Amino acid sequence: RSYSVTGVQTCALPILVPTKVIAVGLNYADHARESGKPLPKEPLFWLKAPTSLIPDGGKIEVPFAQHRTDYEAELAIVIGRRIRNVTPAAAARYIFGYTAAQDVSDRTIQNSETQWARCKSFDTFTPVGPYVETKIDPHDLTIQLFQNGQLRQNSNTSQLIFNAYHLVSFISTNMTLLPGDIILTGTPSGVGPIESGDRLEVRIQGLAPLINTVK
């Protein structure tokens, strides 16, 4: 089904299981600085388990109460066509659209390991939705996260070190991307811990808000 939201064409995001969920790290300079990490010279990415996906309205479940677990607001790319070795200039033709997402992270585990797949792949750690916007420029969008009504993250996708088209191109040189695959483009500064009962809202300019609560 399609919807008209402020004149922008959108599609409902079903409960889908893509072949891949790809997360990109340290893609905003301010977040890299707050993490104490050097700026990447090329996109830093890893795979998240597709079973970590939940929709708008779903509940985030923290597996270890004693661990610090953080919210991370992100713009998500939804792939529309099979891609292999596409150039940045051609990348837009292979993108179905964009939606709001979170890359929830068990920071305690992340800080104890050199790989990030485990700390970000727990069930419910990738909220996505509620709709995919199919006609929107991804390069200059305000991105915000509100925790219980308080603004915690506030940036713009123009601050991405590697923009959406560059990411699609780079990742496609390393692996084939298939329709429905999701790329999380990175989070800006302001990440912080979540607690049971929290209401988290990701607002990205031109996209429907993504709202989830913490169980």
PLM segments and residue spans:
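Short Gly/Pro-enriched turn/cap motifs at secondary-structure boundaries
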Residues: 3, 65-69, 119-123
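Single conserved hydrophobic/aromatic residue that forms the stacking wall/gate
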Residues: 1-11
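Residue "hotspots" at secondary-structure boundaries inside conserved domains
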Residues: 14, 20, 67-69, 169, ...
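Short, structured patches in soluble enzyme cores that scaffold and shape functional sites
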Residues: 48, 73-75, 79-81, 99-104, ...
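Catalytic-pocket segment enriched in acidic/His residues
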Residues: 31, 37-39, 107-215
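Residue-level recognition of short, solvent-exposed, well-ordered loop/turn junctions
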Residues: 16, 23, 55, 70-72, ...
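Extended, compositionally biased flexible segments
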Residues: 12-64
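N-terminal accessory regions of nucleic-acid-interacting proteins
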Residues: 84-98
